[in-house]
Amino acid sequence: MRFFPVLLLIPVMSAAANYSIKRGVVDGVEVVQLADAAHRTEVTIVPSLGNLGYEMKVNGKNVFWTGKPLGELREKPSQCGNPFLAPWANRLDREAFYANGKKYLLNVDLGNVGRDGNRNPIHGLLTFSPLWKVVKEEADEGSARVTSRLEFWRYPDLMAQFPFAHTIEMTYRLAGGRLEVETALENHSMEPMPVAIGFHPYFRVHDAPRDKWKVHLAAREHLVLSRLLMPTGERKPVTFPDPVSLAGTQLDDVFSGLEPNAEFWVQGERERVSVIYGPKYTVAVVYAPTGRDFICFEPMSAVTNAFNLAHAGIYKDLQMVPPGGVWRESFWIASSGF
């Protein structure tokens, strides 16, 4: 990927320092790049495309699967890299959701609600949002980091769909060769705000074909899904082998009962990519379709269709942010053998 600096180039530290941060333009799109020289790691973030983590290169190899050049992605957005899903992740089972005992209808005429193959709402409202603003860029002896903010409450088309005034801050922090993604939700509303956000990162290893990849699932419970990929409320013990071979295996599964500091990973011959979940990411979706050279380990704060399942009494673990409160959690991406 070619990197062209623009007039605003931010060398936050001396040239001898390990961590650095700079802004630039790639394929006509403004980006922020974090670098960890000691671990030969560079991370590229695209604030104007949903604050997307687009690349995490280790020794020149991308840990993320990106699918297309950044200029093409801007013209025709599609899932890749590290997309953020909010205010709900994955699917809803209807064009409405419940919160605090009240039913809220989605206005599909506003054009900001995506749909899955069964015409159900999917992945929230912000996946490729241009509304993110960079508010802080720092690099020192400990890390390189950038924080972006989206003031959800300012935008009527968003509030019409999810009427909880809140602000989202997301920090990408590169330290010790690991990328931390920290998300904070501040609830400005007078009522508790339900939390069902998540991320849908796409990963790959380069030193083996997909059929040679091995996968570790750091969970105890496997959620039973309907034909529409909605949880039924039934949970079964995980019976996959450890590790799982992706040879002839397709995954589009939801897991709970995560191990402490749950670490999901995929490995080729030597290369390994791990995702470590903070404790408030209580659910993992794992997506690995056959015939595609990627796998997704998706940190989720709730199960699919959580708002409606909680209202029905099926899902008991929906997290809430009290009025004036803040929900905050991180997950980490690490690599080895690259």
What are these regions (language model features)?
Residues F3-M13:
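Sec-dependent N-terminal signal peptides
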